[in-house]
UniProtKB/Swiss-Prot annotation:
Residues 1-64 are annotated as: Domain I. This is Holliday junction branch migration complex subunit RuvA. Residues 160-213 are annotated as: Domain III. Keywords: Cytoplasm, DNA damage, DNA recombination, DNA repair, DNA-binding. InterPro entries: DNA_helicase_Holl-junc_RuvA_I, Hlx-hairpin-Hlx_DNA-bd_motif, NA-bd_OB-fold, RuvA, RuvA_2-like, RuvA_C, RuvA_C_sf. The keyword Ubl conjugation does not apply. Residues 144-159 are annotated as: Flexible linker. Belongs to the RuvA family. It is found in: Cytoplasm. Pfam families: HHH_5, RuvA_C, RuvA_N. GO terms for biological process: DNA recombination; DNA repair.
Amino acid sequence: MIARLVGFLVEKNSDSAVIDVNGVGYLVQLSGRALDYFSEIEGEITVHIETQIREDSITLFGFASYLERDWFRLLTSVQGVGGKAALAILTALTCDAISVAISSGDKTMICRANGIGPKIAQRIINELKEKPAAIALFSSAKGDHLAVEDISQPAASAHHAGNFMADAVSALLNLGFKPAEAQRVVQLASEELGDQATLDSLVRLALRLSSKH
Protein backbone atom coordinates (compact mmCIF):
# COMPACT_ATOMS: atom_id res chain seq x y z
CA MET A 1 0.00 0.00 0.00
CA ILE A 2 1.33 3.42 -0.94
CA ALA A 3 0.81 5.96 1.86
CA ARG A 4 3.01 8.84 0.72
CA LEU A 5 4.90 10.04 -2.34
CA VAL A 6 7.85 12.42 -2.25
CA GLY A 7 8.84 13.66 -5.67
CA PHE A 8 8.21 16.23 -8.39
CA LEU A 9 5.02 17.28 -10.13
CA VAL A 10 5.81 16.73 -13.81
CA GLU A 11 2.35 16.77 -15.39
CA LYS A 12 -1.06 17.99 -14.32
CA ASN A 13 -4.59 17.65 -15.64
CA SER A 14 -7.90 19.07 -14.43
CA ASP A 15 -8.26 16.51 -11.62
CA SER A 16 -4.99 14.58 -11.51
CA ALA A 17 -1.23 14.88 -11.71
CA VAL A 18 1.81 12.75 -12.42
CA ILE A 19 4.32 12.69 -9.58
CA ASP A 20 7.84 11.62 -10.54
CA VAL A 21 9.53 9.63 -7.77
CA ASN A 22 13.05 8.56 -8.72
CA GLY A 23 12.14 8.24 -12.37
CA VAL A 24 8.81 6.47 -11.85
CA GLY A 25 5.67 8.46 -12.66
CA TYR A 26 2.63 7.93 -10.43
CA LEU A 27 -0.78 9.08 -11.65
CA VAL A 28 -2.53 10.63 -8.64
CA GLN A 29 -6.12 11.91 -8.42
CA LEU A 30 -6.24 15.26 -6.59
CA SER A 31 -8.79 17.81 -5.43
CA GLY A 32 -8.69 21.16 -7.18
CA ARG A 33 -7.37 22.79 -4.01
CA ALA A 34 -4.52 20.28 -3.63
CA LEU A 35 -3.64 20.60 -7.31
CA ASP A 36 -3.45 24.39 -7.04
CA TYR A 37 -1.37 24.11 -3.88
CA PHE A 38 1.19 21.70 -5.35
CA SER A 39 1.40 23.70 -8.58
CA GLU A 40 2.74 26.68 -6.61
CA ILE A 41 5.66 24.72 -5.14
CA GLU A 42 8.95 24.70 -6.98
CA GLY A 43 10.90 21.57 -6.22
CA GLU A 44 10.07 18.41 -4.32
CA ILE A 45 6.58 17.90 -2.91
CA THR A 46 5.10 15.48 -0.37
CA VAL A 47 1.74 13.98 -1.31
CA HIS A 48 -0.27 12.02 1.26
CA ILE A 49 -1.85 9.04 -0.46
CA GLU A 50 -4.99 6.99 -0.01
CA THR A 51 -4.80 3.83 -2.14
CA GLN A 52 -8.04 2.31 -3.37
CA ILE A 53 -7.87 -1.21 -4.78
CA ARG A 54 -10.67 -2.52 -6.95
CA GLU A 55 -11.00 -5.79 -8.83
CA ASP A 56 -9.93 -4.15 -12.08
CA SER A 57 -7.94 -1.11 -10.96
CA ILE A 58 -5.69 0.55 -8.40
CA THR A 59 -6.28 4.28 -7.86
CA LEU A 60 -4.09 6.70 -5.93
CA PHE A 61 -5.82 9.70 -4.35
CA GLY A 62 -3.47 12.45 -3.17
CA PHE A 63 -3.75 15.19 -0.55
CA ALA A 64 -1.79 18.22 0.60
CA SER A 65 -2.44 17.53 4.30
CA TYR A 66 -3.41 14.79 6.72
CA LEU A 67 -6.63 16.69 7.45
CA GLU A 68 -7.72 16.63 3.81
CA ARG A 69 -6.93 12.91 3.61
CA ASP A 70 -8.87 12.18 6.80
CA TRP A 71 -11.93 14.01 5.46
CA PHE A 72 -11.64 12.01 2.23
CA ARG A 73 -11.72 8.78 4.23
CA LEU A 74 -14.77 9.92 6.16
CA LEU A 75 -16.63 11.09 3.07
CA THR A 76 -15.99 7.84 1.21
CA SER A 77 -17.27 5.89 4.21
CA VAL A 78 -20.74 7.26 3.37
CA GLN A 79 -22.84 4.98 1.20
CA GLY A 80 -22.94 6.24 -2.38
CA VAL A 81 -19.93 8.56 -2.05
CA GLY A 82 -16.98 7.38 -4.11
CA GLY A 83 -13.50 8.80 -4.48
CA LYS A 84 -14.38 11.24 -7.26
CA ALA A 85 -17.39 12.58 -5.36
CA ALA A 86 -15.28 13.05 -2.22
CA LEU A 87 -12.66 14.97 -4.24
CA ALA A 88 -15.41 17.13 -5.72
CA ILE A 89 -16.49 18.09 -2.20
CA LEU A 90 -12.90 18.79 -1.16
CA THR A 91 -12.52 20.96 -4.27
CA ALA A 92 -15.66 22.99 -3.57
CA LEU A 93 -15.18 23.36 0.19
CA THR A 94 -12.29 23.76 2.60
CA CYS A 95 -12.02 21.25 5.43
CA ASP A 96 -13.31 23.91 7.82
CA ALA A 97 -16.31 24.51 5.56
CA ILE A 98 -17.12 20.79 5.43
CA SER A 99 -17.05 20.71 9.24
CA VAL A 100 -19.45 23.64 9.43
CA ALA A 101 -21.79 22.20 6.78
CA ILE A 102 -22.09 18.83 8.52
CA SER A 103 -22.29 20.09 12.08
CA SER A 104 -24.95 22.65 11.13
CA GLY A 105 -26.86 20.34 8.79
CA ASP A 106 -26.39 22.64 5.80
CA LYS A 107 -26.90 20.35 2.78
CA THR A 108 -27.06 23.33 0.39
CA MET A 109 -23.45 24.05 1.19
CA ILE A 110 -22.39 20.47 0.35
CA CYS A 111 -24.40 20.65 -2.89
CA ARG A 112 -21.93 23.26 -4.14
CA ALA A 113 -19.72 20.31 -5.15
CA ASN A 114 -20.12 19.08 -8.73
CA GLY A 115 -22.27 15.97 -8.94
CA ILE A 116 -23.54 16.14 -5.36
CA GLY A 117 -27.32 16.39 -5.09
CA PRO A 118 -29.55 17.08 -2.06
CA LYS A 119 -30.12 13.37 -1.38
CA ILE A 120 -26.41 12.51 -1.12
CA ALA A 121 -25.68 15.73 0.77
CA GLN A 122 -28.31 14.86 3.38
CA ARG A 123 -26.94 11.33 3.66
CA ILE A 124 -23.44 12.71 4.30
CA ILE A 125 -24.82 14.87 7.09
CA ASN A 126 -26.90 12.07 8.60
CA GLU A 127 -24.08 9.52 8.58
CA LEU A 128 -21.24 11.78 9.71
CA LYS A 129 -22.84 14.25 12.10
CA GLU A 130 -22.65 11.91 15.10
CA LYS A 131 -19.73 9.76 13.94
CA PRO A 132 -16.88 9.97 16.51
CA ALA A 133 -14.16 10.27 13.85
CA ALA A 134 -16.00 13.16 12.21
CA ILE A 135 -16.71 14.89 15.51
CA ALA A 136 -12.97 14.79 16.24
CA LEU A 137 -12.36 16.74 13.01
CA PHE A 138 -15.05 19.33 13.67
CA SER A 139 -12.84 20.94 16.33
CA SER A 140 -13.94 24.47 17.12
CA ALA A 141 -15.96 24.69 13.90
CA LYS A 142 -18.72 22.54 15.43
CA GLY A 143 -21.75 24.66 16.19
CA ASP A 144 -20.50 27.60 14.15
CA HIS A 145 -23.43 28.32 11.79
CA LEU A 146 -21.61 30.63 9.38
CA ALA A 147 -23.26 31.26 6.04
CA VAL A 148 -21.77 29.78 2.88
CA GLU A 149 -20.45 33.11 1.67
CA ASP A 150 -18.67 33.63 4.99
CA ILE A 151 -16.66 30.44 4.49
CA SER A 152 -15.46 31.48 1.04
CA GLN A 153 -14.34 34.94 2.14
CA PRO A 154 -10.98 35.80 3.75
CA ALA A 155 -10.80 35.24 7.49
CA ALA A 156 -12.65 37.96 9.33
CA SER A 157 -12.04 36.91 12.90
CA ALA A 158 -9.22 35.77 15.17
CA HIS A 159 -10.99 32.40 15.41
CA HIS A 160 -10.67 31.64 11.70
CA ALA A 161 -7.27 33.30 11.37
CA GLY A 162 -6.01 30.96 14.07
CA ASN A 163 -7.39 27.95 12.22
CA PHE A 164 -5.74 29.05 8.98
CA MET A 165 -2.41 29.59 10.74
CA ALA A 166 -2.52 26.15 12.36
CA ASP A 167 -3.33 24.50 9.02
CA ALA A 168 -0.58 26.49 7.29
CA VAL A 169 1.99 25.41 9.87
CA SER A 170 0.84 21.81 9.45
CA ALA A 171 1.26 22.09 5.67
CA LEU A 172 4.82 23.39 6.07
CA LEU A 173 5.67 20.62 8.51
CA ASN A 174 4.48 18.11 5.90
CA LEU A 175 6.90 19.74 3.46
CA GLY A 176 9.82 19.11 5.82
CA PHE A 177 10.05 22.43 7.67
CA LYS A 178 11.20 22.39 11.28
CA PRO A 179 8.45 23.44 13.74
CA ALA A 180 10.15 26.68 14.80
CA GLU A 181 10.78 27.77 11.20
CA ALA A 182 7.24 26.88 10.13
CA GLN A 183 5.77 28.90 13.00
CA ARG A 184 8.06 31.85 12.25
CA VAL A 185 7.32 32.22 8.53
CA VAL A 186 3.57 31.61 8.97
CA GLN A 187 3.48 34.31 11.65
CA LEU A 188 5.30 36.71 9.31
CA ALA A 189 2.90 35.85 6.49
CA SER A 190 -0.11 36.37 8.76
CA GLU A 191 1.13 39.79 9.85
CA GLU A 192 1.68 40.82 6.23
CA LEU A 193 -1.70 39.57 4.95
CA GLY A 194 -3.78 40.72 7.91
CA ASP A 195 -7.55 40.25 7.47
CA GLN A 196 -7.05 39.12 3.87
CA ALA A 197 -5.35 35.89 5.01
CA THR A 198 -6.63 32.57 3.70
CA LEU A 199 -5.01 29.16 4.07
CA ASP A 200 -3.74 29.21 0.47
CA SER A 201 -2.34 32.74 0.69
CA LEU A 202 -0.66 32.03 4.04
CA VAL A 203 1.12 28.93 2.73
CA ARG A 204 2.22 30.57 -0.51
CA LEU A 205 3.56 33.69 1.18
CA ALA A 206 5.23 31.64 3.92
CA LEU A 207 7.05 29.60 1.27
CA ARG A 208 8.22 32.78 -0.46
CA LEU A 209 9.37 34.30 2.83
CA SER A 210 11.27 31.16 3.79
CA SER A 211 13.22 31.26 0.52
CA LYS A 212 14.40 34.80 1.32
CA HIS A 213 15.98 33.85 4.66
